[in-house]
Amino acid sequence: MYSLLRPLLFRLDAEKAHSLTLSLLHYLPGFYFRKIAGQPVHAMGLVFPHQVGLAAGLDKNGEHLDALAKLGFSFIELGTVTPKGQAGNPKPRLFRIAEANAIINRMGFNNSGVDVLVENVKRANYKGILGINIGKNKETNLNQAAEDYLYCFRKVYDHASYVTINISSPNTPDLRQLQQGDYFAELLTQLQKEQIKLADQYGRHVPLVVKVSPDETDETLKQMTDIILQYGIEGIIATNTTCSREMVKNLPCSEEQGGLSGRPLMELSTRCLRLLKQYVGNDVTLIGVGGIDSLESAKDKINAGASLLQVYSGLVYKGPELIHDIVSGLNAI
């Protein structure tokens, strides 16, 4: 069905097509949806039905949680959500590079605020594994950034299976500085202390996950993993989008500002994943994302060290069948 819809959707502005696709999910007939049986994965104290989940960014506010659940994901990550709602960057801010199965976005954490997301999650019927990705508001300076993350963490704790700390988006000014040295250590210190309090308050432990940039040096990644191991962070998502354009040079829209995702990100993000595996071994769960649009690319991520996978841009180009193709292919190995 998606192969019939895609040419029509691709005639629309990318952000309009995104919104329309999410709306259409609510009206698809029941026979289109199916459960996908896979090999369970035990990670971060959770049992994932199979390896393939949805990356953050598709449903920022949790408005489409039940519809997305019917596509067969092992887990769904909502967000990025911030303490207060914000409009994000001016439009247009989402661009396809169809020649390369790629997307450039400079959305800028557009979302309705954490309170709206929580209410949407509470209304949903979804009972599966839910990640919630949290960030800071654009106007919050770096010295106060930890307060934004703590505020969101407290709000979502009782509704999340795990919480992702997004400090690697290229579309919020200076955000990636939070991956550096003292900023990073202080942020994790405060979040870990809050995690202990919240676990006692709610009677359950919710793992923290860090989403990293593919554009950091090997030295920075090593410093980050040392701090991650020190503070007992249980997961790393590798990776966010890249600012590099080497892989799409001279293609239409390639000069647009923002983060590049999709197939051209595959090599860079997988290299980062492989490096992280060397640094953390089996002590931290690695979630591979970036360029997964086939069984082969999924296998490459797993071989590089990923226990779990996330897709987003691959869905735009391949449709929901991508989930089934990957899971059934991994089952056959």
From Swiss-Prot:
Compartments (UniProt record): Cell membrane
Catalytic activity: (S)-dihydroorotate + a quinone = orotate + a quinol
Cofactor(s) the record lists: FMN
Subunit structure, interactors included: Monomer.
Gene, per the UniProt record: pyrD
Record bears the keyword rRNA-binding: no
Protein name: Dihydroorotate dehydrogenase (quinone)
Annotated residues for binding of substrate: 60, 105-109, 166, 171, 240-241
Known function: Catalyzes the conversion of dihydroorotate to orotate with quinone as electron acceptor.
Binding site for FMN: 56-60, 80, 133, 166, 211, 239, 262, 291, 312-313
Gene3D superfamilies per record: Aldolase class I
Active site per UniProt: 169 (nucleophile)
GO terms for biological process, alphabetical: 'de novo' pyrimidine nucleobase biosynthetic process; 'de novo' UMP biosynthetic process
GO annotation, cellular component aspect: cytoplasm; plasma membrane
Family of this protein: Belongs to the dihydroorotate dehydrogenase family. Type 2 subfamily.
Organism (species): Legionella pneumophila subsp. pneumophila (strain Philadelphia 1 / ATCC 33152 / DSM 7513)
Alphabetically ordered keywords of this record: Cell membrane, Flavoprotein, FMN, Membrane, Oxidoreductase, Pyrimidine biosynthesis
GO molecular function: dihydroorotate dehydrogenase (quinone) activity
Keyword Flavoprotein applies: yes
Pathway, per record: Pyrimidine metabolism; UMP biosynthesis via de novo pathway; orotate from (S)-dihydroorotate (quinone route): step 1/1
Co-factor: note: Binds 1 FMN per subunit.
Known EC number: 1.3.5.2
